């Protein structure tokens, strides 16, 4: 009887051990799909970007497709942490939905990109200057804009180069090949975007501006709080100068520098353009207070930045001087008062006395320094 009882206990223990083994195996099988789901979830988090064709603000013919391909190649080489939509797929969406304006993103275009192209963000590249005359010149601004509402500028950067910026002794470093200068310009932009996509976040302009290009006249109201975050809409500058698109170009400079400060939420210029069209606002000589009220109301902004481009000159070849002349002001929405304004005029050879040392050869590089120094007076 005792033996039978011990035998029964042993059988029960044996069966219990087998049951535990099956339970452990089943648990492992149950957890395996969770691991796969987690891996797919991480991959799904990679941002999907639609790179628009280069928008030409140079006023002259330029190899826009070559610039786009160069940018995509450099981003791929830098192993940017993003998925880029194939150009033929993007072209098909643009054609199907008749998207005509590629220099900015409005709500309707963003929805198309999000739904039809499944894009999380759009890369917008604007060409300001392109010249193959020796020494060649190029200027580019690029920005990444989210397609989810509210649209947000996630990243923006730019560059302006001339082949004779750093010619070196006996011109041994002079760049005469336009394609070489193009690669030299695009590569830093691709690196900057790659760094942002890797999680480094927004950074202020790393290049130190030349103090000699600071504004001549500055006004700043005490009502403008330095420790407050403002939402600002930058309106294209009134442009009586001889340079086509100078108003849009200078607006991009201010957007870039305000974004870099960190305490300004800058409205995507495509939304500003959309509101100007919908409200039928025509700036014959600048923006009026009534127009500023309309824009601030519909875009829900604290400040409106606008101004006037008096001169914006580039030159071809070796002989010439880059010139930039502008005024800008910030209008506060509630008080309808100007809380900040500047006036700035400079030439590329300001303060240059020997061997062209310190000379600035493109209006882009000159305006970049001037606008950065002007914007810094807001803080």
What are these regions (language model features)?
Residues 2-12:
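Bacterial N-terminal signal peptides that target proteins for export
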Residues 12-21:
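Bacterial N-terminal signal peptides
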Residues 26-47, 69, 113-116, 132-137, ...:
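C-terminal/domain-edge helix-coil "capping" segments
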Residues 46-48, 58-118, 122, 235, ...:
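N-terminal segment of the mature soluble domain
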Residues 56-59, 90-92, 128-133, 161, ...:
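Solvent-exposed loop/turn segments at secondary-structure junctions
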Residues 99-105, 142, 287, 319, ...:
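A short, hydrophobic/aromatic-rich structural module that often spans a beta strand
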Residues 138-145, 324-330:
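A short beta-strand signature
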């Amino acid at each position: 009887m005792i033996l039978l009882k011990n035998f029964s206990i042993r059988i029960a223990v044996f069966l219990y051990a087998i049951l535990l083994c099956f339970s452990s195996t089943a648990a492992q099988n149950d957890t395996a799909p969770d691991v796969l789901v987690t891996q797919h979830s991480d991959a799904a988090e990679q941002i999907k970007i639609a790179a628009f064709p280069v928008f030409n603000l140079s006023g002259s013919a330029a190899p826009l497709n070559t610039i786009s391909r160069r940018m995509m190649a450099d981003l791929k080489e830098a192993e940017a942490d993003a998925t880029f939509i194939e150009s033929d797929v993007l072209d098909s969406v643009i054609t199907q939905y008749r998207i005509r304006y590629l220099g900015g993103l409005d709500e309707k275009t963003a929805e198309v990109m999000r739904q039809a192209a499944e894009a999380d963000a759009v890369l917008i590249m604007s060409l300001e200057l392109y010249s193959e005359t020796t020494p060649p010149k190029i200027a580019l601004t690029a920005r990444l804009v989210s397609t989810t509402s509210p649209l947000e500028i996630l990243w923006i950067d730019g560059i302006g180069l001339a082949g004779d910026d750093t010619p070196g002794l006996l011109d041994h470093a002079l760049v005469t090949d336009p394609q070489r200068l193009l690669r030299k310009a695009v590569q830093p932009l691709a690196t900057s975007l790659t760094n942002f996509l890797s999680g480094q976040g927004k950074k202020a302009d790393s290049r130190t501006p030349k103090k000699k290009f600071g504004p001549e006249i500055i006004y700043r109201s005490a009502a403008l709080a330095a420790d407050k975050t403002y939402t600002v809409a930058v309106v294209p500058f009134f442009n009586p100068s001889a340079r086509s698109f100078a108003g849009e170009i200078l607006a991009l400079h201010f957007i870039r520098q305000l974004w870099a400060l960190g305490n300004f939420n800058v409205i995507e210029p495509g939304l500003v353009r959309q509101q100007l069209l919908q409200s039928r606002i025509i700036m014959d000589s600048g923006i009026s207070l009534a127009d500023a009220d309309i824009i601030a109301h519909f875009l829900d902004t604290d400040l409106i930045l606008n101004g006037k481009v008096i001169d914006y000159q580039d030159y071809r070849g070796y002989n010439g001087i880059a010139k930039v002349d502008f005024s800008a002001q910030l209008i506060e929405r509630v008080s309808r008062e100007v809380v900040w304004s500047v006036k700035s005029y400079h030439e590329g050879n300001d303060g240059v006395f020997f061997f062209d040392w310190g000379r600035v050869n493109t209006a882009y590089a000159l305006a970049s320094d001037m606008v950065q120094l002007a914007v810094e007076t807001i803080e």
